[in-house]
């Protein structure tokens, strides 16, 4: 049977046994990929510095998803939060990866069994003896089971009643750890950044799924609805399933890109909007101001800023800075962060504190401009020296570092001042090791960016797939060329197009 590549799935159209087989094989491939990818990532992951070289800087993709569900330890003796773990237990990263691979193998064998033994009694209609599936009943079964899984996840896993809980952190991604979460049943449960909403929504959605599943198991659809929505056609199942998948893909693309409790910044990196809004910068300044109010010196106040918080306030961690076709992790771009040099404070010869204008997300280059507290331009690095009025040399700008490795160090040499002014455009200044990975200095996106791009792209593709298969199943009779209102006796083979008397075959 010479089928073109885009029609090969017709072989399982009226073959329930082998339809089940290919879906089990698909599950085997998905689970096998997940387990294998996890083992690969564990082989290349360096857990030694969770602050300056976290998983998202190293381009890990599946490890963050395991971590947000409660896995933090490795059989290698390390924990993702730092420190040694003497007894990680069976549900370590490797344990979960191994479970997926074993499950994949079992699904592989089950797929082969169902391919060979395709003509099972369960798939035949006792009235006609032909293979058929009771699709409304199958829908009810799947809805019920999905509801049980959803309810169980929210009521047991997330709450810690029987399970580890989930990854929970503070708004600035500093204190993250796996912990149990109480369901949020009030209006706060609708805040996308409240972890309690994850528990309550899974419990509520699971309950609804269980009830809806029982309804569809006990109530048959009306005949007109059954025929109108083509409920007996397997392509209807395909169309509506694609709709569910593309809708979910659009939703998770949004929660990933804009941020939510389900996508912690410690696991996936910060969002671009946190750079755009100066989110971490404001928190750093708030902490410094609080320190100064307690009679700390500038040096003491800046030294108390966590390195982790300062690192978030660096444009190289902005997922929107990576180009679409720049492959590799963030570490392959600007390098592996080694240490925070400290916060540079610039002053002119009159003693005014100057602030470097930060580079907006979608700029590759940006003029170096220093403004005072009122936003008035006081210094810059000019493009044309002949016309300059505010050059670092003319204004006499100096820089002094507070906190970090250069704490207390000051520079007045114009070349050095300009170097640090350029780097201050990019947020807090870090020492970056480009030699180890031969990093090219060009920014890369984080797994947050890849996930969003991938899911948004496939959601769009699947949206068109839903329209395509929905149209095929709703208008199958039209596409087949049979007019449902045709009263005349139709002789198969008499016309080139079935039922069209204008295309009567010529007898030679």
From Swiss-Prot:
The chain crosses the membrane at residues 21-36, 101-115, 140-156, 203-218, 237-252, 457-472. Binds multiple chlorophylls. PSII binds additional chlorophylls, carotenoids and specific lipids. GO terms for molecular function: chlorophyll binding; electron transporter, transferring electrons within the cyclic electron transport pathway of photosynthesis activity. GO terms for cellular component: chloroplast thylakoid membrane; photosystem II. Gene3D superfamilies: Photosystem II CP47 reaction center protein. It is found in: Plastid, Chloroplast thylakoid membrane. It comes from the Eukaryota. GO terms for biological process: photosynthetic electron transport in photosystem II. Keywords: Chlorophyll, Chloroplast, Chromophore, Membrane, Photosynthesis, Photosystem II, Plastid, Thylakoid, Transmembrane, Transmembrane helix. The keyword Transmembrane helix applies. The keyword Disulfide bond does not apply. It is a multi-pass membrane protein. Belongs to the PsbB/PsbC family. PsbB subfamily. PSII is composed of 1 copy each of membrane proteins PsbA, PsbB, PsbC, PsbD, PsbE, PsbF, PsbH, PsbI, PsbJ, PsbK, PsbL, PsbM, PsbT, PsbX, PsbY, PsbZ, Psb30/Ycf12, at least 3 peripheral proteins of the oxygen-evolving complex and a large number of cofactors. It forms dimeric complexes. This is Photosystem II CP47 reaction center protein.
């Amino acid at each position: 049977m010479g089928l073109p590549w885009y029609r090969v799935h017709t072989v399982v159209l009226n073959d329930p046994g082998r339809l089940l087989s290919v879906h089990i094989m698909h599950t085997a491939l998905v689970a096998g990929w997940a387990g294998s990818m996890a083992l690969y990532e564990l082989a290349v992951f360096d857990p030694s510095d969770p602050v300056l070289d976290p998983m998202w800087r190293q381009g890990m993709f599946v490890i963050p998803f395991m971590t947000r569900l409660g896995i933090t330890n490795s059989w290698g003796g390390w924990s993702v939060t730092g420190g040694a773990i003497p007894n990680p237990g069976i549900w370590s990263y490797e344990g979960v990866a191994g479970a997926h691979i074993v499950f994949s193998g079992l699904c592989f064998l089950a797929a082969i069994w169902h391919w060979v033994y395709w003509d099972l009694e369960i798939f035949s209609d006792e009235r006609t003896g032909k293979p058929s599936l009771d699709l409304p009943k199958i829908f009810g079964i799947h809805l019920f089971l999905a509801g049980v899984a959803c309810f169980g996840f929210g009521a047991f896993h997330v709450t810690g009643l029987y399970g580890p809980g989930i990854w929970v952190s503070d708004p600035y991604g500093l204190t993250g750890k796996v912990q149990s979460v109480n369901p949020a049943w009030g209006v706060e449960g609708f805040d996308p950044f409240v972890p309690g909403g994850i528990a309550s929504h899974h419990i509520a959605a699971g309950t609804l799924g269980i009830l809806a599943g029982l309804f569809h198991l006990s109530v048959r659809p009306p005949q007109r609805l059954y025929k109108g929505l083509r409920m007996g056609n397997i392509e209807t199942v395909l169309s509506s399933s694609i709709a569910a998948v593309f809708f979910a893909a659009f939703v998770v693309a949004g929660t990933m890109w804009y941020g939510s409790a389900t996508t912690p910044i410690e696991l996936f990196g910060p969002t671009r909007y946190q750079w755009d809004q100066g989110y971490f910068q404001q928190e750093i300044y708030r902490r410094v101001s609080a320190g100064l109010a307690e009679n700390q010196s500038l040096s003491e106040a800046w030294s108390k800023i966590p390195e982790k918080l300062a690192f978030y306030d660096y444009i190289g961690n902005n997922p929107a800075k990576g180009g679409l076709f720049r492959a590799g992790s963030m570490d392959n771009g600007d390098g592996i962060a080694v240490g925070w040099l400290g916060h540079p404070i610039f002053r002119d010869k009159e003693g005014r504190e100057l602030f470097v204008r930060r580079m907006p997300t979608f700029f590759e280059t940006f003029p170096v401009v220093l403004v005072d507290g009122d936003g008035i331009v006081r210094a810059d690095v000019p493009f044309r020296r002949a016309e300059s009025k505010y050059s670092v040399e003319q204004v006499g700008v100096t820089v002094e570092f507070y906190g970090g490795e250069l704490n207390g160090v000051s520079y007045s040499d114009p070349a050095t001042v300009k170097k640090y002014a350029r780097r201050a455009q990019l947020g807090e200044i870090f020492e970056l090791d480009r030699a180890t990975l031969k990093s090219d200095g060009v920014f890369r996106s984080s797994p947050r960016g890849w996930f969003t791009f991938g899911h948004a792209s496939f959601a769009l593709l699947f949206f068109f797939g839903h329209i395509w298969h929905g149209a095929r199943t709703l208008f199958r009779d039209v596409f087949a060329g049979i007019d449902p209102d045709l009263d005349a006796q139709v002789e198969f083979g008499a016309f080139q197009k079935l039922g069209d008397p204008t295309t009567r075959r010529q007898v030679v």
